[in-house]
Amino acid sequence: MKAFTQHTGLVAPLDRANVDTDQIIPKQFLKSIKRTGFGPNLFDEWRYLDVGQPYQDNSKRPLNQEFVLNHERYQGASVLLARENFGCGSSREHAPWALDEYGFRSVIAPSFADIFFNNSFKNGLLPIILSDEEVEELFKQVEANPGYQLTIDLQAQAVTRPDGKVLHFEIDAFRKHCLLNGLDDIGLTLQDGEAIKAFEGKHRAAQPWLFRDA
């Protein structure tokens, strides 16, 4: 998993509340068991004018020019600004996979659905909760200032605006540790690799009948 320490990136404003996981990555794209290939279909029903299908050549599909991610000024955005209850709906880890592969490192919103919130941390995507007032002010500033960037410092738990104002956010200490060090569930387990090997060795010696090759 990619570590997250500090990031400065262009902000794209998604001015919609209650964005659910089927809108983030529609159900027809969930057939793949790989973690890659979802970025081109992020917000598929909003980005394109036709109905997308798996393994389709998206370069030939008609774009919805009114959708924010298709605007020239937001090309290359790596911070998504959203409204309340982002990531609601059914549980699908493909949602943070799609956001990550598109290029987003963080999503800022007043609130998130619990499962999406948890899945994001496990996949290197930082969800940041700010107050309604702070988010509203960010929407106004992004709209008024092309090329608007934010700097996110995870260690300091701070979001710095271009005008120098700092917005602080809360994060669980364990999740912070994992993101700073790029540790997903597998990475955490592998930290105890030697202890696991030692236990397995003792277990095999004490109960050899449990192992076919003993």
Curated annotation (Swiss-Prot):
Coiled-coil ranges from the UniProt annotation: none
Record InterPro entries: 3-IsopropMal_deHydase_ssu, Aconitase/3IPM_dehydase_swvl, AconitaseA/IPMdHydase_ssu_swvl, IPMI_Swivel, LeuD
Function summary: Catalyzes the isomerization between 2-isopropylmalate and 3-isopropylmalate, via the formation of 2-isopropylmaleate.
Domain of life according to the entry: Bacteria
Name of the featured protein: 3-isopropylmalate dehydratase small subunit
Sorted UniProt keywords: Amino-acid biosynthesis, Branched-chain amino acid biosynthesis, Leucine biosynthesis, Lyase
CDD domains with a match to the protein in the record: IPMI_Swivel (cd01577)
Biochemical pathway: Amino-acid biosynthesis; L-leucine biosynthesis; L-leucine from 3-methyl-2-oxobutanoate: step 2/4
Single GO MF descriptor: 3-isopropylmalate dehydratase activity
E.C. code: 4.2.1.33
UniProt entry tagged with the keyword Lyase: yes
Catalysed reactions, semicolon-separated: (2R,3S)-3-isopropylmalate = (2S)-2-isopropylmalate
Any one Gene Ontology BP term: L-leucine biosynthetic process
Transmembrane residue ranges: none
Pfam families: Aconitase_C
Species of provenance: Pseudomonas putida (strain W619)
Encoding gene (name): leuD
GO cellular component: 3-isopropylmalate dehydratase complex
Record-linked NCBIfam families: leuD, PRK01641.1
Gene3D superfamilies for this protein: Aconitase, domain 4
Quaternary state and interactors: Heterodimer of LeuC and LeuD.
Family statement: Belongs to the LeuD family. LeuD type 1 subfamily.
